[in-house]
């Protein structure tokens, strides 16, 4: 039952691919291949786009499973002491209920109305299969999530207490990290929550010894020795070979058909916009080289040194490089680094869902929001120093925060789009202007005269797939605040029989 809580987050329907399509509405990533739901990238969505339906259903499924486990274990606990495994399992269930609830809450909830949620343990005679109540505000959802994370901390072990076979399970520090993220998003509606963000990140350092890995590359390494650094908080550990596991995302973003060597899918490519932002730190810096490939950049692929070019699908001129380390080995699939099944192209990488670098970014943001720009600079400079970048001189600004968060976490499942949405809603005027500019921009690409020649000349122009935005005859949608929440799938509205109210503006 516990393993069933984790299984969906590994699959294509969540962090394998589907939840990442949402990022097309920001300017860091373009889809690379034409999809049937381009409205998801142009703020014309209805809630019925298949990625939105799929992720909504999968997260609610995890919540339901966790609810069942919690109710059963609490019922047993009322009559007898739980075993050590049952105690840990109760903590895992609380964590995964909070986890899945959170990803629904912030993406669909606002201060005007929350998202549906119920706790099975609140029914004395057992859950009656009634429709979960829609909370009055997303703040009510956040309160439930924090309570579940506190219970998770009560029952879970520390990460260091796990044996090798159990690493990857929820642990105390992971729950504290998600508390920090919940409080940061809660601060969209209540700025006093920034103080809680600072407290949580401090606790991660002082109580749990979390820190940055020595090198930026270590976070995305194919070496098992680097999977569990102090930076690790929670993620999806993957491997390859004949018994692959983890997220298929590394193969999803690989060049379509992998230059005839491996079955990459060619989806989700970097835009020129994120390259332009990252290159502000200097050409060839450690962070940009690990994060993306540009034309002519050398990289190792199945034991061969190549120079990047791309002839497949819709042109962007770049490819995500963060998760490519496992592909560098000769016979990488046969040696267990990447999956031998190109239809499930996992690889040996511990793909982060939340890591300590993000905690420093949240604390820096909290310091800016509470008028401590000097302390914000200290946290941001820890990231910059690790990547061998020039430190910020003097106090940090909101522009510094925007740049560091965008560049450090590029192409991770940290939800850059929601960063823009929350900054537009509640941000300082400086960062709101940056968010508004990106939300209303059309992503750009490099268009090469000869796509098969890495020395070819190029022009910078609009990405050519999101047809409504590229077509001058169709007026672009101007971002406004109601887009902070997605619309519920129409099937959910219908099934609720009136118990679920659609979000404003849809």
What label would you give each PLM region?
Residues 6, 59-62, 126, 144, ...:
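Long, intrinsically disordered, low-complexity segments
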């Amino acid at each position: 039952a516990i393993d069933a809580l984790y299984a969906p987050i590994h699959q294509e329907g969540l962090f394998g691919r589907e939840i990442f399509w949402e990022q097309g509405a920001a300017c860091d990533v373009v889809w690379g291949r034409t999809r049937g739901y381009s409205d998801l990238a142009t703020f014309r969505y209805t809630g019925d786009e298949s990625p939105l339906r799929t992720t909504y259903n999968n997260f609610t499924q995890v919540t339901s499973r966790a609810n069942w486990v919690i109710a059963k274990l609490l019922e047993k606990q009322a009559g007898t002491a739980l075993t050590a495994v049952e105690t840990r399992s109760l903590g895992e269930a609380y964590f995964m209920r909070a986890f899945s609830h959170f990803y629904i809450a912030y993406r669909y909830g606002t201060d005007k109305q929350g998202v549906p949620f119920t706790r099975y343990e609140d029914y004395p005679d057992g859950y009656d299969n009634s429709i979960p109540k829609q909370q009055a505000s997303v703040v009510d959802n956040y309160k439930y999530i924090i309570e579940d994370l506190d219970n998770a901390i009560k029952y879970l072990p520390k990460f260091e207490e796990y044996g090798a076979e159990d690493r990857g399970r929820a642990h105390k520090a992971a729950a504290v990290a998600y508390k920090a993220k919940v409080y940061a998003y809660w601060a969209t509606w209540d700025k006093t929550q920034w103080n809680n963000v600072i407290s949580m990140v401090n606790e991660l350092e002082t109580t749990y010894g979390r820190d940055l890995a020595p090198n930026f590359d270590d976070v995305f390494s194919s070496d098992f020795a680097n999977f569990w650094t102090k930076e690790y908080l929670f993620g999806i550990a993957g491997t390859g070979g004949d018994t692959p596991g983890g997220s298929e995302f590394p193969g999803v973003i690989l060049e379509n058909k992998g230059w005839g060597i491996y079955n990459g899918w060619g989806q989700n490519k970097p835009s020129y916009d994120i390259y332009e932002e990252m290159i502000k730190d200097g050409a060839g810096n450690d962070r940009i080289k690990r994060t993306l490939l540009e034309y002519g950049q050398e990289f190792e692929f199945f034991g061969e040194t190549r120079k990047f070019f791309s002839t497949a699908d819709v042109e962007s001129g770049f490819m995500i490089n963060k998760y490519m380390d496992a592909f560098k080995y000769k016979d990488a699939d046969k040696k267990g680094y990447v999956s031998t099944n190109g239809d499930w192209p996992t690889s040996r990488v511990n793909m982060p869902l939340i890591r300590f670098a993000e905690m420093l970014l949240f604390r820096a943001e909290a310091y800016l929001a509470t008028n401590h720009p000097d302390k914000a600079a200290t946290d941001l400079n820890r990231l910059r120093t690790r990547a061998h970048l020039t430190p910020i001189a003097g106090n940090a600004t909101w522009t510094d925060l925007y740049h560091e968060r965008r560049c450090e976490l590029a192409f991770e499942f940290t939800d850059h789009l929601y960063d823009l949405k929350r900054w537009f809603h509640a941000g300082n005027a400086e960062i709101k202007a940056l968010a508004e500019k990106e939300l209303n921009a059309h992503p750009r690409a490099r268009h090469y005269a000869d796509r098969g020649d890495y020395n070819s000349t190029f022009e910078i122009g609009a990405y050519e797939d999101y047809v409504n935005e590229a077509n001058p005859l169709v007026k672009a949608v101007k971002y406004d605040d109601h887009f902070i929440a997605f619309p519920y799938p129409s099937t959910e509205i219908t099934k609720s029989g009136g118990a679920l109210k659609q979000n404003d503006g849809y």
